[in-house]
Design a protein with these regions (language model features):
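Soluble catalytic domains of membrane acyltransferases
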Residues: 55-140
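A transmembrane-helix-recognition feature enriched in membrane-embedded lipid enzymes
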Residues: 1-61, 111-112
Length: 140
């Protein structure tokens, strides 16, 4: 039964993510700031997390949110599942995303992500990738 629920959730997640990607791309044409448009990925993350709870029984606890600094900061997540991608959208405040540059080449999803002007790095570039993150991070 769990396998069937997981399959249903995955199919809905792919559909919802595709539709959300199109909405994000279209929203980039509006005279809105990135921060104003951030409501879209935030809602996407909240909805997919709720859906995972409703269909698959996902339960989670966020601890330490009160310790997030008020000034800009770097949030590092050990990427262990698809869920942590969703959670980042609503657990931390709107942020500049850091990702491997290949992600922006993914049709619809990557194009949508690129409208938020992420810091896209070449992970094989070593130290120069770190310098790129520092430089672009300071600019934001």
């Amino acid at each position: 039964m769990q396998a069937l629920r997981s399959l249903i959730y995955t199919m809905l997640m792919v559909l919802i993510t595709g539709v959300t990607g199109v909405i994000v791309i279209l929203s980039a044409l509006l005279p809105l700031t990135i921060k104003q448009r951030y409501v879209i990925p935030r809602t996407w993350g909240l909805f997919l997390t709720w859906l995972a709870g409703a269909i698959c029984g996902l339960k989670y606890t966020v601890e330490g949110q009160e310790n997030l600094p008020q000034q800009p900061f770097i949030s590092l997540w050990k990427h262990s599942s698809t869920w942590d991608t969703f959670a980042q959208m609503f657990v931390v405040p709107p942020a500049a995303w850091l990702l491997k540059r290949e992600v922006i080449w993914i049709p619809i999803v990557g194009w949508a992500v690129s409208t938020y002007k992420p810091i896209a790095i070449n992970r094989s570039a070593g130290h120069s990738a770190v310098n790129q993150v520092i430089k672009q991070g300071r600019e934001r």
